[in-house]
């Protein structure tokens, strides 16, 4: 039953997505059949329903307008290879690292493009030329608004009412199907020949699958299409894995991300060989599949078979469907996929995420999806690096004399309370390429007295990369000219890197300590006693002690930490 219901829903959506992508409607049906069956059989989710989706419309339409239909098939084929490789190399989990502002931004942009792109069909405008650029398509609408066909508006209005009203009164019946049937009957019998139909625009829909044909793939074509293919693959991966997560939440199952990508990849490799367009997991159809009692991938296979039977038996009737009936279906899809609440909430908070969101959205609408994704990701990475670099804190500290445990504190360091021979710095945050220079300047720029000992407290440094190690090496070599460097509390990852680079041996194994207190005791042993005479800073409790008493105190504290 689930496969039958989803198959009925998929037919009008497949044709609508194909038309909006700039290709004949039958190619959407071919995609629904072939990709739908393969994704169900080979994917990593038991309930996934695959096929053409709205997210692909702008990128596919752009490829068709710029490179032609055959190159669209090649781009889809390349995207399938990329998806398969992503699954083989277990990159499925990496998709979750794509920032939410980027995905919401381009999804909202796609929704706007789809919605505005259907206005001419909704209004029945004649003489409208399709352009790849959004702004030119808007101009076309205003230039031809006087050609509005009220019969088309009436047809589209009937379909829209059916699409919106059917779920409310008859929740088990697919709204798009009822909308198409009702509006087609009205247009056919009440005002025949007054509105453009699929048949009058694209010709009759054949009632059989196309023959196998391998596209002519050359190195030049690969270089030409690799960028849009990458975007198709990324969009397909995001959509399919998001759909699989939704299915997991509804069914209590657990999908296999990498297997899902392999299934999506194989489907997109084979589908273009039969004239199909790129496909991915469809969230709405997958949810419908589960709601109607699906228990296995068989429902997805049945959905493809149902579409095939409809193609064979009822293709001539599909040619009579008005284009005005397709428009409201796609408009509702655009409205539902826009994530408008998340979009406006993220804009309201006015953070760097808001900036990423708006820029990605605007580039999607006014430039192209490829540029939008590239710029959005680069901007997100740069702003993330900036935020992470701001988290590094390097403060000069001393033991707090008012704390019985002698914990260090930056507030007790003053011009009259600071040891000239020992400098202690508390380092907090990831020490990576974005923060390394700030770290170095914070230490070298504030140690004016050339201390004999530099103690770095690195217990709050979770990460050290090679750039951070390089700047730490600069500090070590700078201070080794007149003293030594001690490090306390270092974490496993930074320590492992220092061992690999050799800096651990340069600093010296004996100069690494688990506890700051023991490191301070060691530092006190290295002091030039003559410089301590007459010193008024009293940075440490031991400063007022005699040399023999000092040594005795050090040994006692060592025993206390080792016990």
Regions flagged by a language model, labelled:
Residues 1-402:
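Transmembrane helical cores of multi-pass ion-transport proteins
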């Amino acid at each position: 039953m689930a496969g039958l219901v989803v198959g009925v829903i998929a037919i009008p959506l497949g044709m609508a997505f194909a038309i909006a992508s700039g290709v004949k409607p039958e190619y959407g049906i071919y995609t629904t059949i072939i990709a739908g069956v393969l994704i169900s059989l080979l994917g990593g989710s038991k309930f996934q329903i695959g096929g053409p989706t709205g997210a692909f419309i702008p990128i596919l339409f752009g490829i068709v307008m710029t490179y032609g239909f055959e190159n669209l098939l090649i781009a889809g084929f390349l995207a399938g290879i990329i998806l398969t490789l992503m699954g083989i190399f277990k990159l499925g989990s990496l998709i979750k690292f794509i920032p939410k502002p980027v995905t919401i931004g381009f999804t909202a942009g796609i929704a706007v493009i789809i919605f505005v792109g259907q206005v001419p069909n909704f209004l029945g405008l004649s003489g409208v030329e399709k352009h790849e650029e959004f702004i030119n398509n808007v101009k076309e609408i205003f230039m031809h608004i006087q050609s509005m066909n009220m019969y088309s508006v009436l047809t589209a209005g009937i379909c829209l009412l059916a699409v919106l009203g059917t779920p409310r009164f008859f929740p088990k019946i697919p709204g798009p199907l009822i909308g198409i049937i009702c509006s087609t009957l009205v247009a056919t019998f009440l005002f025949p020949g007054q509105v453009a139909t699929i048949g009058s625009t694209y010709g009759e829909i054949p009632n059989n699958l196309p023959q196998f044909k391998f596209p002519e793939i050359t190195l030049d074509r690969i270089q030409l299409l690799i960028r849009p293919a990458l975007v198709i693959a990324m969009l397909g991966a995001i959509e399919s894995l998001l759909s699989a997560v939704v299915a997991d939440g509804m069914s209590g199952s657990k999908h296999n991300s990498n297997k899902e990508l392999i299934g999506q990849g194989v489907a997109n490799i084979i589908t273009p060989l039969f004239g199909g367009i790129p496909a991915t997991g469809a969230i709405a159809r997958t949810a419908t599949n589960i709601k109607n009692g699906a228990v296995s991938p068989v429902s997805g296979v049945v959905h493809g078979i149902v579409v095939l039977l409809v193609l064979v038996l009822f293709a001539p009737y599909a040619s009579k469907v008005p284009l005005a009936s397709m428009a409201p279906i796609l408009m509702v899809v655009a409205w539902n996929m826009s994530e408008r609440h998340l979009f406006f909430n993220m804009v309201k908070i006015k953070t760097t995420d808001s900036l990423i969101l708006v820029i990605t959205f605007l580039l999607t609408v006014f430039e192209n999806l490829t540029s939008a994704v590239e710029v959005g990701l680069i901007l997100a990475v740069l702003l993330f690096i900036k935020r992470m670099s701001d988290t590094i804190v390097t403060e000069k500290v001393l033991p707090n004399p008012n704390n019985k445990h002698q914990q260090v504190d930056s507030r007790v360091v003053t011009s009259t309370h600071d040891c000239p021979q020992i400098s202690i710095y508390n380092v907090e945050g990831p020490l990576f390429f974005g923060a390394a220079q700030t770290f170095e300047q914070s230490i070298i720029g504030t140690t004016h007295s050339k201390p004999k000992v530099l103690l770095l407290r690195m217990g709050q440094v979770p990460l050290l990369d090679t750039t951070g190690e390089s700047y730490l090496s600069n500090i070590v070599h700078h201070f080794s000219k007149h003293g030594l460097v001690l490090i306390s509390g270092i974490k496993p990852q930074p320590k492992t890197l220092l061992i690999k680079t050799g800096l651990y041996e340069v600093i010296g194994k004996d100069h690494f300590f688990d506890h700051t207190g023991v490191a301070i005791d060691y530092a006190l042993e290295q002091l030039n006693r003559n410089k301590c005479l007459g010193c008024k800073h009293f940075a440490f409790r031991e400063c007022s002690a005699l040399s023999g008493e000092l040594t005795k105190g050090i040994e006692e504290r060592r025993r206390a930490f080792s016990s």
